[in-house]
């Protein structure tokens, strides 16, 4: 990678696009060069906001050509990820891409993007930021140490109250991709990170709206070693104004319970230990949203600077879409 500052562009200026724009803009090695937003109203607004910042505002990604970009962030709706990324590659605009979760609308699209990305030979990443949580990271560290013995089973959940009280006629969940793509994908990725590749074995329950989009779902899965686990995902769970993700892991010598903010270790001998987020050096250089977002962006930048593929590459992240497709196939 070149010695000069990395030149970044961002496509899609919704909540996530603005978050990533703010974060990369404070990383010294990055220069935010251009933003792409198709909405005429938003385009005019951002031209006023960034008029003195030297950032180019465009309404078509074709206008990214000639800007000598090192990487582009794709933060458009999930349904457009595949077409936008393919266009970036086909037009030779950029080789390095960060895309918000999920990689694509389904596993077939994800496989196609992986194949194209291999041919382009760039660096790519998908935004499963929970892997950058100090709490979940500590849980994985404890698991790998081996002091808990053999991992026997796990439970995983992802809850929010976003659609609590809405009727089945509401299409709000569908507009965000459904509970699996919008919410459950994060805890599925955490499980893949902790336990390896998973195969769905059964769908226990599913609630869908009239658009056919799941609002809550429960399913079981297992890995090649025979480890079994259960997932519960809901966008209409009471008491979760902010989304929460959690895992419980039962081992032969104890168990781990972890969510976004705290971790507990309980040994069969009766010994207990607890950690909270603030106990685990959660500080970052710039805080916006959650600290995980800064670490995620810094990891992408560092991968570009050192010319190494990200752990959360298209290839690895496509396995989340693989699991989601299995669940949807069984629940249809």
Question: Predicted regions span which residues?
Answer:
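Contiguous beta-strand/loop segments that form the cofactor/metal-binding neighborhood of enzyme cores
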Residues: 189-262, 294-308, 325
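Beta-loop-alpha module in the N-terminal Rossmann-like domain of NAD(P)-dependent dehydrogenases
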Residues: 20, 52-116
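Rossmann-fold dehydrogenase core element
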Residues: 110-130, 150-154
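Predominantly a Rossmann-like dinucleotide-binding segment in NAD(P)-dependent oxidoreductases
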Residues: 130-209
